[in-house]
Amino acid sequence: PEEICTLVIAESFPEDAGIFTCSARNDYGSVTSTAQLVVTSANTENCSYDSMGEPNSDHFQHFPPPPPILETGSYELASQKPSEIQQVNTPNLGFNMAALQMQFNSAERETNGVHPSHGVNGLINGKAYGNKSPPTPAALLSPTKEPPPLLAKPKLGFPKKASRTARIASDEEIQGTKDAVIQDLERKLRFKEDLLNNGQPRLTYEERMARRLLGADSANVFNIQEPEETAANQEYKVSSCEQRLISEIEYRLERSPVEESGDEVQEAEVPVENAAAPFFEMKLKHYKIFEGMPVTFTCRVAGSPKPKIYWFKDGKQISPKSDHYTIQRDVDGTCSLHTTASTLDDDGNYTIMAANTQGRVSCTGRLMVQAVNQRGRSPRSPPGHPHARRPRSRSRDSGDENEPIQERFFRPHFLQAPGDLTVQEGKLCRMDCKVSGLPTPDLSWQLDGKPIRPDSAHKMLVRENGVHSLIIEPVTSRDAGIYTCIATNRAGQNSFNLELVVAAKEAHKAPVFIEKLQNTGVADGYPVRLECRVSGVPPPQIFWKKENESLTHSTDRVSMHQDNHGYICLLIQGATKEDAGWYTVSAKNEAGIVSCTARLDVY
């Protein structure tokens, strides 16, 4: 991503001259850019205005050095006759006058002839001429290679030479002019945005640079500081990371129980063929505003029967009786949530969910609330109120101008959390959760209020999809209790609790034969029983085999029987010669297996 880095010198002095280097580094390398700053000192003879000067006084020939670009010089363009224009052959003025002419033309083109009081460089003072362009001094249009002349318009009479030193502008004048420059630039950007919305050409490179220097929220700041213009909420697009977070919140809310207010009237049932799941005809939008401003989320929902509406902030349901939020619903399905004065705590994701008997649907709008002084500039003084005077030294300590940029923090929020668990002793237990927040929260686990330390039986893992897991293997009776998961970051903390119940391990006992099979003989055509008794904990499973062939199911002639007391029987109705042979019965459970064999003879 691009980033514009700017070094601003509010008032230049000769000692500021030199080579300035900007370096950028990351893990993959570094890059540098170098530029030289030349500061031209003022001439020994400086100009001043004589309020009582005569019309035929000598014209002045020396000027203070021009102010640097993006600063606060305030020369006026005089629409004098060519005979009254004086040329000053000072090479150092060439670049600044070229910049002045470029800005002059740009301002005229972008404002349809209405010339702002200050341009981007702070070099223009003009007036509104309606649809007519002001007369352009001939000297500025001269195609010669000589430096363009500097035009001056004296307030009273013509300027004359004077031996006094130039007056240094006061802090109030400097600050006032800087504010005027910034205000004018914001006006131009707003005007350009209106053109863009109407399909006009895109912003130029210089305008994009100015937008980045002022910040993307320049239009909103302008609205706040000029009350005569209506402040409007600024829509913006959320990042892919925020969109994933929004999707996870909606997925969870649509599958979670909600609190019923009881105020809504129960809708009459509609025929199944006329029923329709809720859907949004107009979804919520994302807004970026300043604290103290009002904001309204609006959408329109339809469905049959009429859906019930629920509002959430960061996954937490908003009560319809909230004092801070006003919730409304019109007959056409338009739903709105409004707050008259937003605070920094209102920053977050706002979700509306519509539900009826056919299903649920939700959509989310992101609200970004910014502090009024977020851009690092002090609020402008109201009209008629001068700026407070601050001490200023030649060293120009810029400590106040290097205030840190305000970061965005989001309190941890659990997107997924487990409920109470019951696990058998000796088994594996896994507790999974997923949390969001900025910066990334740190998770800790507690058992009955005591921290859990990782060891051979307790492991804490984080998967690539952001799911945190506490794994206990094997579970013992000491692991039973109330578990607390705490997520913490710079914005705050959040937690959830669950209870783990450990079921006692059964006392396993291997099967054992109390009575074994006995060798048996039977006459052909008569019934016969092969019987035994077995015990074991848990009760064992029984398997029968004849020779090496398994008897898997009973038939009308050969059936297998078993009761709860361990009695086992193989019943053969009408034995034949083919039934003779060796029979084996096996008993098996988790603790072991045991077998017994006997012979059946048929004669």
Swiss-Prot record:
The Ig-like C2-type domain, residue ranges: 278-362, 412-503, 511-601
Modified residues (Phosphoserine): 133, 142, 170, 256, 261, 378, 381, 393, 395, 398
Disulfides per UniProt: 433-485
Interaction with VASP: region residues: 63-67
Free-text tissue specificity from the UniProt record: In adult central nervous system is detected in the brain and spinal cord, specially in the olfactory bulb, cerebral and cerebellar cortices, hippocampus, amygdala, superior colluculus, and superficial laminae of the spinal dorsal horn.
Function: Cytoskeletal protein required for organization of normal actin cytoskeleton. Roles in establishing cell morphology, motility, cell adhesion and cell-extracellular matrix interactions in a variety of cell types. May function as a scaffolding molecule with the potential to influence both actin polymerization and the assembly of existing actin filaments into higher-order arrays. Binds to proteins that bind to either monomeric or filamentous actin. Localizes at sites where active actin remodeling takes place, such as lamellipodia and membrane ruffles.
Similarity remark: Belongs to the myotilin/palladin family.
Subunit structure, as described in the record: Interacts with EPS8. Interacts with LASP1. Interacts with VASP. Interacts with ACTN. Interacts with SORBS2. Interacts with PFN1. Interacts with LPP. Interacts with SPIN90. Interacts with SRC. Interacts with EZR. Interacts with RAI14.
The protein's name in its UniProt record: Palladin
Species of origin: Rattus norvegicus
Classification lineage: Eukaryota, Metazoa, Chordata, Craniata, Vertebrata
Gene that encodes the chain: Palld
